């Protein structure tokens, strides 16, 4: 599949959920997201997990937005 983007993009995904951090739920979607982005020519460079705390979510998202071409949120 051809890339739709000029140059190489870098992406990050922010995974939100106390259940992920506690181990009650396993994150099975980041792998799918990484493959999909790769098919578009976008490299997933970071996946960050934060709990359900608004200030932590905002801080993490702002950090990812500043460092990558594309930031995705997975709740």
Segments (PLM) and residue ranges:
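N-terminal, positively charged, Ser/Thr/Ala/Gly-biased leader segments
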Residues: 2-3
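An anion/phosphate-binding loop that grips the pyrophosphate of nucleotide cofactors and donors
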Residues: 68
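Glycine-rich phosphate/diphosphate-binding loop of Rossmann-like nucleotide-binding domains
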Residues: 8-40, 46-47
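Conserved small/polar residues in nucleotide/adenosyl-binding loops
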Residues: 74-75
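Receiver (REC) domain switch-region micro-motif
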Residues: 71
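Short beta->alpha junction loops
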Residues: 46-56
């Amino acid at each position: 599949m051809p890339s739709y983007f000029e140059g190489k993009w870098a992406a990050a995904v922010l995974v939100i959920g106390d259940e992920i951090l506690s181990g009650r739920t396993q994150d099975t979607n980041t792998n799918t997201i990484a493959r999909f982005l790769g098919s578009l020519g976008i490299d997933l460079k970071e996946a960050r997990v934060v709990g359900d705390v608004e200030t932590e979510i905002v801080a993490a998202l702002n950090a990812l937005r500043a460092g990558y071409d594309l930031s995705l949120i997975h709740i």
